[in-house]
Amino acid sequence: MVEKIRIIGIDPGLRRTGWGIIDFLGNHMHFVASGTLHSDAQLNLASRLHQLHKGLSEVVHQFMPHEAAVEHVFVNKDATATLKLGQARAIALLVPAQAGLPVFEYAPNTIKKSVIGVGHGAKEQIHMMVKRLLPRAEFDGHDAADALALVICHSAHRTNFAHRIKG
């Protein structure tokens, strides 16, 4: 009997954190839900991080995934922005870990290569492929679509790892 695995993907950001959930039953993918959490830019950093923590905790509690995949941050020229993104990413790692989930991390180029076949591509290409692989998927923006792409990436790596163990 094939076991259903539910995976959440998290695309962290201080302004917007995308999330997407897909069920896997054997080789079949089934879209469950996706969305974008927003933090209030008028609040201080601690309050914004709290908003993200609370929102992501509610998503994990509601959908009860088995595994989580989180995107690695990229370093840019603005050190302050990179630091804030890193703090939002810490929330994205912490929430599933607190729920007892194994957490996996993927670089943006790895995600793109898994979804569209090359490590460099436009967001539109990724979103088009997510829609092709998950025709019933609904996402409210780039961040949620990226989170779904992250789940697809993790499922490919998860499957390859399982085959290596069996072989």
Curated annotation (Swiss-Prot):
Alphabetized InterPro entries for the sequence: RNaseH-like_sf (IPR012337), RNaseH_sf (IPR036397), X-over_junc_endoDNase_RuvC (IPR002176)
Annotated GO CC locations: cytoplasm; Holliday junction resolvase complex
GO molecular function, one term: magnesium ion binding
Annotated cofactor note: Binds 2 Mg(2+) ion per subunit.
Annotated Pfam families: RuvC
Keywords per UniProt: Cytoplasm, DNA damage, DNA recombination, DNA repair, DNA-binding, Endonuclease, Hydrolase, Magnesium, Metal-binding, Nuclease
Active-site residues per Swiss-Prot or TrEMBL entry: 11, 71, 143
Gene Ontology BP terms: DNA recombination; DNA repair
Enzyme Commission code(s) on record: 3.1.21.10
Binding site for Mg(2+) 1: 11, 143
Residues that hold Mg(2+) 2 according to the record: 71
UniProt catalytic activity: Endonucleolytic cleavage at a junction such as a reciprocal single-stranded crossover between two homologous DNA duplexes (Holliday junction)
Keyword DNA damage tagged: yes
Cofactor or coenzyme needed: Mg(2+)
Function (record text): The RuvA-RuvB-RuvC complex processes Holliday junction (HJ) DNA during genetic recombination and DNA repair. Endonuclease that resolves HJ intermediates. Cleaves cruciform DNA by making single-stranded nicks across the HJ at symmetrical positions within the homologous arms, yielding a 5'-phosphate and a 3'-hydroxyl group; requires a central core of homology in the junction. The consensus cleavage sequence is 5'-(A/T)TT(C/G)-3'. Cleavage occurs on the 3'-side of the TT dinucleotide at the point of strand exchange.
NCBIfam families tied to this protein: ruvC (TIGR00228)
Protein name (Swiss-Prot/TrEMBL): Crossover junction endodeoxyribonuclease RuvC
Species of the source: Bartonella bacilliformis (strain ATCC 35685 / KC583 / Herrer 020/F12,63)
Gene (UniProt): ruvC
